[in-house]
Design a protein with these regions (language model features):
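Generic N-terminal amphipathic, Lys/Arg-enriched alpha-helix
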Residues: 1-21
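C-terminal binding/interaction regions
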Residues: 109-123
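A short, well-structured juxtamembrane/interface segment
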Residues: 21-39
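Hydrophobic packing residues in well-ordered alpha-helices of helical domains and bundles
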Residues: 7, 26-29, 55
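Charged catalytic carboxylate motif
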Residues: 13, 25-28, 124
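Glycine-rich, small/polar surface segments that engage phosphate groups of diverse ligands
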Residues: 35-107
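Residue-level recognition of alpha-helical structural elements
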Residues: 3, 22-26, 51
């Protein structure tokens, strides 16, 4: 089996995705995150597989950079990062509950949950 890859096609695909973005929606999402962060709310992010890595990366950058750039604290957590907790919920309850159970324990009204999915197919 031969893997066919073209840098040119890869770049074209990324340009197509970028051009399809709804800029107003993206700006609205950024503003929501900023408002929650600067009002002291918790922001939790989660995802499965590669999306879990993306979620972790967002929180890493936000926790570090918000403080370094503004001097303000950022209260962010990635629900995918605690492997022991994720697998405990998966084993004792169901994989469907690995994030919802953490949300019950960590988030309060008006906090923010961001779910990341590259495929859109995850049911949890």
């Amino acid at each position: 089996m031969t893997l066919k890859f073209s840098v040119s096609n890869y770049i074209k695909q990324h340009i197509s995705v970028i051009n399809s973005l709804d800029v107003a929606e993206l700006e609205s999402a950024i503003e929501l995150i900023r408002d929650k962060a600067f009002s002291g709310k918790t922001i939790a992010v989660c995802g499965n597989g590669g999306s879990a890595s993306a979620a972790s990366h967002y929180i890493t950058d936000w926790n570090k950079m918000v403080n370094l750039e503004t001097g303000r604290r950022f209260n962010g957590v990635c629900l995918s990062d605690n492997v022991g907790l994720v697998t405990a919920y998966a084993n004792d309850l169901s994989y469907d509950d690995v994030f919802s159970e953490q949300v019950k324990n960590l988030l309060f009204p008006n906090d923010l949950l961001i779910t990341v999915s590259g495929s859109g197919n995850s049911e949890n």
